[in-house]
Regions:
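Elongated, amphipathic alpha-helical interaction scaffolds
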Residues: 1-183
Length: 183
């Protein structure tokens, strides 16, 4: 195992400050927030982000998204004592879908509730007073993780609202995609 492989496997045990120091020294960890935003969150790299999102959302190669605009990553709290969100990358796709991509190196044991909170906060941020619910567009939250949330060998998981007895999907308005152990 080379030095680079050792760094990747050890990165999950570093503090956020240590990861930032490693990045400042020129050691790049591909799931570091700063590096990820630099690589995929800039106007001059929109094609990379579009290709990434299409590959993650449509693994069959259909590449349904044709364009997008970056959107505000900061979501304000919806009530006085509410919690705001600072997301990694947010985009409004050409079809109106909202896509959020998060990278996470460490399992802080709150990932599932935080993921659901981010997904629903982004979805509800579409609505303005007086708007029609039929104007809501689908929201997709993609989480690239350097750890495993679930047992087993599956690394890609898709979650949607569905009937727990039949598995019938209610709608695809809220989709959470999880890609695990991407080191």
């Amino acid at each position: 195992m080379g030095d680079e492989d050792t760094f990747y496997s050890e990165a999950a045990s570093l503090t956020d400050k240590q990861l930032e120091e490693e990045l400042d020294k020129g050691r790049v960890y591909r799931l570091n927030d700063r590096f990820f935003k630099f690589l995929f969150g800039r106007e001059d790299r929109k094609t990379l982000f579009l290709d990434l999102v299409n590959a993650l959302v449509f693994p069959d190669g259909t590449a349904e998204f044709t364009g997008f605009e970056y959107a505000n990553r900061e979501l304000s709290a919806t009530r006085d004592e509410g919690k705001a969100c600072s997301l990694d990358i947010v985009a409004v796709m050409a079809d109106g879908s909202r896509v959020e991509v998060e990278v996470q190196v460490k399992n802080r044991n709150d990932h599932v509730p935080r993921s659901v909170y981010y997904l629903t906060a982004l979805h509800t941020s579409q609505m303005n007073s007086g708007a029609s619910y039929s104007d809501l567009t689908r929201t997709i939250s993609i989480h690239l993780l350097a750890f495993s949330l679930f047992a087993g060998k599956r690394f890609r998981r898709t979650f949607r609202l569905c009937d727990t007895e039949t598995g019938e999907t209610l709608c695809d308005d809220l989709t959470l995609l999880s890609w695990e152990t991407l080191i």
